[in-house]
Amino acid sequence: MKAGKCWGQTEFIHGNGVLEFHRIEFKKDHRCSKHMHRTKYNGFYVEEGKLLIRVWQDDQGLIDETILQEGDFSVVSPGKYHEFVGLRDGVAFELYWAQFNHSDIVRENSGGKV
């Protein structure tokens, strides 16, 4: 389902207890609200267009501005205020996830030729 926003529109693709995946269409010279997520990482992958990501740290003010073009990916850590600005009309994929342990696998046997 697509939802209209002042900066374009967002479409929810998938979500579960630890991940959300959205497709966003953003407009040139429009921005989302400055906001933060307490526990979620927020990733942006630009498929087409140009997107500026701004990140703030409470005690330091604006600490980063990253320009993403087609094929670029950037991550905002939990607890950091951020916003995006469309520098050129485009499409991006937005991911939200919680940190997990990559080495949590427990193998019962080894893979190989059968």
Place the predicted regions along the sequence by residue.
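A short, N-terminal "cap"/entry segment at the start of jelly-roll beta-barrel domains
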Residues: 1-23, 31-34, 66-70, 109-114
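Double-stranded beta-helix
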Residues: 3, 85-114
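Short, well-structured hydrophobic secondary-structure segments
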Residues: 24-40, 44
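A generic "binding-loop/recognition-motif" signal
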Residues: 30, 39-40, 80, 88, ...
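Glycine- and acidic-residue-biased ligand/ion/polar-headgroup-sensing regions
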Residues: 39-58
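Short acidic-glycine-tyrosine-enriched beta hairpin
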Residues: 57-79
